[in-house]
Design a protein with these regions (language model features):
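Short, surface-exposed beta-edge/turn micro-motifs
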Residues: 16, 43-45, 62-65, 118-121, ...
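A generic local secondary-structure boundary/capping motif
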Residues: 8, 112-115
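Conserved hydrophobic/aromatic beta-strand scaffold that supports enzyme active sites
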Residues: 18, 32-36, 85-87, 123-125, ...
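Short, structured beta-strand-loop surface elements
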Residues: 54-108, 118-121
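An N-terminal domain-cap segment
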Residues: 1-60, 68
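Solvent-exposed residues in well-ordered beta-strands and their adjoining turns
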Residues: 40, 50, 91-93, 127-129
Length: 157
């Protein structure tokens, strides 16, 4: 459970990562986008993205994606910092759940309220299938979706 706790703490402490999608233009190639996110109560990443963005077009063709979140470290300590790869499927948040997603997202990114209602923007959510967590040298491994969702980000272990 230590890795699950670490992954949840890391994802909760940061608000941007690299969203990796499968390129719709170049089949078989990954496409990474620096993307702000927030978490819902289950630790699922929420995104506010435009239909014009390449990553949104990629998700429409293939919803499987990864979100890489890492600690901000100096060049000397880059590999010793924690990082997590959240793997899952990304889809637009259903209308009935949009108010809760909006509230969670705008709490972390209040400036996004300026464009949240533009016609080409919508809230998306990743349903996490599995997480690969690296807590530094010697602490790494896969975390199940249920362990990740059940971990308390405020807990120290």
């Amino acid at each position: 459970m230590e890795k699950a706790q670490g992954a949840r703490r890391l994802a909760a402490a940061h608000h941007q990562g690299v969203l990796c999608t499968n390129s719709a233009k170049r089949e078989g190639y990954p496409f990474g986008s620096v993307t702000p996110y927030a978490l819902d109560g289950q630790g699922r990443p929420l995104f506010l993205i435009s239909s014009m963005a390449v990553h949104t077009k990629n998700l429409a063709a293939n919803p499987k994606a990864a979100l890489l979140v890492s600690e901000e470290t100096s060049e000397e300590g880059l590999l010793s910092g924690a990082r997590a790869n959240l793997l899952g499927s990304v889809a637009e948040v259903p209308d009935a759940e949009e108010p809760a997603a909006r509230e969670a997202y705008l709490a972390q990114h209040p400036a996004a309220a300026q464009w949240a209602d533009f016609g080409d923007f919508a809230f998306y959510r990743m349903d996490v299938a599995e997480v690969y967590y690296v807590g530094g040298f010697g602490m790494m491994g896969w975390v199940s979706a249920s362990d990740y969702a059940g971990a308390n980000p405020a807990s120290e272990g």
